[in-house]
Amino acid sequence: MGQKINPLGFRLGTTQSHHSFWFAQPRNFSTGLQEDEKIRNSIKNYIQKNRRISSGFEGIARIRIKKRIDLIQVIIHIGFPNLLIEGRTRGIEELQINVQKEFHFSNRRLKIAITRVEKPYEQANILAEYIALQLKNRVSFRKAMKKAIELTEQTDTKGIQVQIAGRIDGKEIARVEWIREGRVPLQTIRAKIDHCSYTIRTIYGVLGIKIWIFVD
């Protein structure tokens, strides 16, 4: 059987960069890692609660974290900044205060910035979220997959593969369904590929969505 490596980890240092950038002593590494995860979850929860439109759609492509001795810098790459609460500057300030309260950063400053993603549907995370929303609204899985591919094709990507696994359409036996358009060269390290694994809870159980996008 073929062993499937994570396409992002496989390309670190060539076409991919780390989403967290900091140094720590080996004994403190796990604490720093858990802190990163908590910061990301806190930001996602805040955006979910304070969206203008209650669509269940976050539109976050990725959250990058850079740490120094006295500063934690968080950059949120978001596809649809308009979904955030009114007054972008006020929204960022509120988010910053909210995260700072939760973690009690005594000797470190927290700085949050928001960057708009040029082509949202070129991002695997945003696309997976879109498919998940369609499946929650009882849209046929094939229709959701085809619509996602149509949205990606508008962004000049070279190829896309979408896979859904689980009790699709409420069938008793779990199965895997996938669709591919264009080229997705997983073995070529030079190929810039965006990948995402996304879990969604439906009334029938848990479904897993995987997306591979050949960007360049």
UniProtKB/Swiss-Prot annotation:
Sequence ranges assigned to domain KH type-2 in this UniProt record: 43-118
Keywords associated with the record: Chloroplast, Plastid, Ribonucleoprotein, Ribosomal protein, RNA-binding, rRNA-binding
Pfam families in the cross-refs: Ribosomal_S3_C
InterPro entries attached to this UniProt entry: KH_dom-like_a/b, KH_sf_prok-type, Ribosomal_S3_C_sf, Ribosomal_uS3_bac-typ, Ribosomal_uS3_C, Ribosomal_uS3_CS
Keyword RNA-binding assigned: yes
Similarity comment text for this entry: Belongs to the universal ribosomal protein uS3 family.
HAMAP family, alphabetized: Ribosomal_uS3_B
Name assigned to this protein: Small ribosomal subunit protein uS3c
Native organism: Dioscorea elephantipes (Elephant's foot yam)
